[in-house]
Amino acid sequence: MNNQPCSIVWRRFLTSKVKPAVRIPNENLKANKPTNFTKNFPLNERTKAWERAGEDKESWFKRKYAHVHAKQKSQPQVDLYGKKEAHYSRLKQDILSSKRQQEEHKSKYSRKSVTLGLRPNPLMEYIYGTNSVIAALN
C-alpha cells in the first residue's frame, strides 16, 4: 500500500515535464557555435577555356564556333526520304480538296432568284395590299 502512492507521485513527476514535438539532433552542439557558410563554397574552381586563353567569353565563342553557321549555310538541305516534299504536297492537296468541298456545298444552296423563297402571303396582301417585300425585290 505504501508503494502505490509513491508510484503515482513518480508518474506525475515524469508526465509533468512538457516534451518538444520535434527533437533536433545534436542540439546542444549547434546552439553555441556561429553558423559558417564558407564550408558550403567550393574550394577550387575549374578555370574556363576563355580564361586560359586570356579572352572574354563572347569573343572566344565567336572564334571557336564561327565556321559552324557558314558550313550549314553552304550545304544544301538534304531530304533523303522525301518526307518534306511529301508533307508539302499533302498540305497543298488538302487545301485544294477543302476548297472543292466548299464550292460543292455552296453550289447545292445557290438560288437563281432571291424571290423564289418568298411566297405571297394572302393575309399580308389583305392588310397592306401587295406584299411590299416582293414588290421591292421585283
From Swiss-Prot:
The keyword Transferase applies. Keywords: Methyltransferase, Mitochondrion, rRNA processing, S-adenosyl-L-methionine, Transferase, Transit peptide. One of its GO terms (biological process) is methylation. Signal peptide: none annotated. Its EC number is 2.1.1.-. It catalyses: a guanosine in 21S rRNA + S-adenosyl-L-methionine = a 2'-O-methylguanosine in 21S rRNA + S-adenosyl-L-homocysteine + H(+). One of its GO terms (molecular function) is methyltransferase activity. S-adenosyl-L-methionine-dependent 2'-O-ribose methyltransferase that catalyzes the formation of the 2'-O-methylguanosine corresponding to position 2270 in S.cerevisiae 21S mitochondrial large ribosomal RNA, a universally conserved modification in the peptidyl transferase domain of the 21S rRNA. This is rRNA methyltransferase 1, mitochondrial. It comes from Lachancea kluyveri (strain ATCC 58438 / CBS 3082 / BCRC 21498 / NBRC 1685 / JCM 7257 / NCYC 543 / NRRL Y-12651) (Yeast).
